[in-house]
Amino acid sequence: LPCGHSKEELEEKGIQVIASNLDTAVADVPAVSGAMTMPVINKEYQYVVDLGGNDVGTLVLGRIKPLLDHAEADFFMVVNAYRPNTSTPEGIIEQMENLEYAAGLKVTGFINNTNLVRETTAECLLHGDEVLKEVTKRTGVPVKYVSYVKDVMTEEIPEGLSGELFPMEFNMRKTWM
């Protein structure tokens, strides 16, 4: 579960949580719940699999990959151009290639999630867009979405950003985070 979130809080918001029932804080190896395959098998589900931005997340993907309909599944890479490993086109491309290799899938699109949490401005979105436009030029992989937190963005969203706008809300992030 995301840091500081409880399963109950998420379920109150209509989100079904599928996670390991092991205490991952003390477990020596990562564990994947068998229920992880449920949304893949039942085509009525709309679901997101958060791989967590590291190699451990590919274990989840390894479990569901054989069941995926590759023609219907998108494999997005979320990019924050203010993170050290994804601050340049070269870094993003390297991370994308590592992710594709580990997952055995091709990235079908980027999500521009360039942010400074509660300090995010229109300039942040423009910076991420500029970096990702160069990545798209080099790889042919398009930007599909631009995500931002509505309450944080007091400025108008810039026009001409690559991708569809995807406004979000802080649901459970504590104000001190």
Region annotations inferred by a language model:
Residues D55-S162:
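Conserved catalytic-core segment of NTP-binding enzymes
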